[in-house]
Every structure is written in structure tokens, then in C-alpha cells.
């Protein structure tokens, strides 16, 4: 099936539609300061994004993408609580939509595509970000990293989306910047689009085998044009 023949577009959020790294970095560093821990530059934190808030904080406390197995559980829990409070206050300070996203989503909706979001970000943050960046009311379904017991790369969020939207895998495509998006799609037998401009831990997303791969959102829009 050609990409433009798909009916449902399942979008990741961070690194796909929104460059949220600046605000995530701000919240992470505010958290680390509160805990009297060393802070990090935005580029470093950028590579820790994509597996949900808990993993992001574990990486920050470890000072590495590889989580310290000796991390104190109580410290991690406290740090996560502090981080979520800070992030709530800075969701859209520096976060921006990637080029062509707002106009592109409007055109896709007008063309008859059904749009949904499947992100590993806590669900409580999704709607405020969409509203703050002017792309609310475009999506039929919003699934966060804590909506279900499992998050990407587990296929459960994608299966849940199909059930809620009353569609089958062949009608859908998962669009994201991370290996988690591609692996989740494969596990759910859904085709996927890899976007190279996002937060894939410095890895080439092509190595995970998406059916399509684009360097810009506009290239995606061109391929979806009916």
C-alpha cells in the first residue's frame, strides 16, 4: 500500500511534531539543582529524551544514557515528582513546532486523514502542549506513556489506538523520530515512517527498518499528498 493510501496517521510528539528538548532540559536542570546535583547542557539532555519521564530522570541522575543500576529508588521517585512539577510550569516556554507542522497537519486533516498521537510523554502534558502550540482539536485520540501499563516500543499503545479508532493495521502508519516508534510499529504489524531530524539517541533511524524515511516534515507531506 502506498503511503498516501493510509487512512490513519499515528504521530509521535517529541522530536516528531514538537522540538521540546529546550523545555525538557530546563525542567531537568531545575530538578538537578533542587537536588544539588550537577546540571547538563541541552545537547546532552537531548539524547536522553524518548523513553518517558522516568527514564529521562534516571538518565539525568546517572549523568549518562546508560542508567546506573545502583540508583537509589527513593531518590529517583523524589526526582521524578520534582521534575513533573517543574515541567508543568515550562511546557511551552521554548518548545516549538518543527517547520511545516502546523500547516501540514491542517492540510492532512482537510484531505481526510485521521490523526492521533502516541507518545511516551505523560498524558497530562499532551493537551496543554497541543493547545499552547496551536495544534489542538486536530487529533481524534491522544495516548501518553502512562495511558496504559506499557509504552512504546511495546505494541500495546498502537493496538489500543486501533481498537479505539476501529481500524486495522493496514489502514495505519506510525510516524516518529525514534527507534521506539519503529519497533512498536513492527511489533503491531503496522507500517512506519522514520523522521531523521528528531531525538533518536544519535542513531540512524534507517537501521531499524521503517518502510519510509524522510529528512523533513515537508518531505512527509509531499509523500502523503493525494
Swiss-Prot record:
**Catalysed reactions listed for this entry:** 2-phosphoglycolate + H2O = glycolate + phosphate
Q: Which Pfam families match?
A: HAD_2
Q: What Gene Ontology biological process does one annotation of this record name?
A: glycolate biosynthetic process
Q: In which pathway does it act?
A: Organic acid metabolism; glycolate biosynthesis; glycolate from 2-phosphoglycolate: step 1/1
Q: Which amino acid positions bind Mg(2+), per UniProt?
A: 12, 14, 177
Sorted alphabetically, the Gene Ontology cellular component annotations on this record are: cytosol
The EC number on file is: 3.1.3.18
First-tier enzyme category under EC: hydrolase
Which keywords has UniProt assigned to this entry?
Carbohydrate metabolism, Hydrolase, Magnesium, Metal-binding
> Which cofactor names does the annotation list?
Mg(2+)
The reply to whether Magnesium figures as a keyword in the UniProt entry is yes
Alphabetically, the GO molecular function entries are: metal ion binding; phosphoglycolate phosphatase activity
- Per the Swiss-Prot or TrEMBL record, the active site comprises 12
Gene3D superfamilies in the record: HAD superfamily/HAD-like, Putative phosphatase, domain 2
* Protein role: Specifically catalyzes the dephosphorylation of 2-phosphoglycolate. Is involved in the dissimilation of the intracellular 2-phosphoglycolate formed during the DNA repair of 3'-phosphoglycolate ends, a major class of DNA lesions induced by oxidative stress.
- Per the similarity annotation, which family is this? Belongs to the HAD-like hydrolase superfamily. CbbY/CbbZ/Gph/YieH family.
UniProt protein name: Phosphoglycolate phosphatase
User: What is the species listed in this Swiss-Prot or TrEMBL entry?
Assistant: Colwellia psychrerythraea (strain 34H / ATCC BAA-681) (Vibrio psychroerythus)
Amino acid at each position: 500500500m502506498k503511503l498516501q493510501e493510509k487512512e490513519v496517521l499515528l504521530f509521535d510528539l517529541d522530536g516528531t511534531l514538537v522540538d521540546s528538548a529546550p523545555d525538557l532540559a530546563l525542567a531537568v536542570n531545575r530538578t538537578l539543582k533542587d537536588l544539588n546535583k550537577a546540571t547538563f547542557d541541552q545537547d546532552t539532555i537531548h539524547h536522553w529524551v524518548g523513553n518517558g519521564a522516568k527514564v529521562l530522570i534516571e538518565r539525568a541522575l546517572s549523568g549518562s544514557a546508560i542508567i546506573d543500576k545502583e540508583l537509589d529508588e527513593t531518590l529517583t521517585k523524589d526526582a521524578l515528582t520534582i521534575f513533573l512539577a517543574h515541567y508543568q510550569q515550562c511546557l511551552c516556554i521554548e518548545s516549538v513546532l518543527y517547520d511545516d507542522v502546523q500547516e501540514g497537519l491542517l492540510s492532512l486533516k482537510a484531505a481526510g486523514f485521521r490523526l492521533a498521537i502516541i507518545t511516551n510523554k505523560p498524558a497530562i502534558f499532551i493537551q496543554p502542549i497541543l493547545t499552547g502550540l496551536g495544534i489542538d482539536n486536530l487529533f481524534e485520540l491522544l495516548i501518553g506513556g502512562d495511558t496504559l501499563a506499557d509504552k512504546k516500543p511495546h505494541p500495546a499503545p498502537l493496538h489500543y489506538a486501533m481498537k479505539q479508532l476501529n481500524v486495522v493495521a493496514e489502514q495505519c502508519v506510525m510516524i516518529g523520530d525514534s527507534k521506539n516508534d519503529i519497533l512498536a510499529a513492527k511489533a503491531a504489524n503496522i507500517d512506519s515512517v522514520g523522521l531523521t531530524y528528531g531525538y533518536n539517541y544519535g542513531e540512524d533511524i534507517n537501521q531499524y527498518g521503517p518502510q519510509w524515511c524522510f529528512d523533513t516534515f515537508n518531505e512527509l507531506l509531499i509523500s502523503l499528498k493525494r
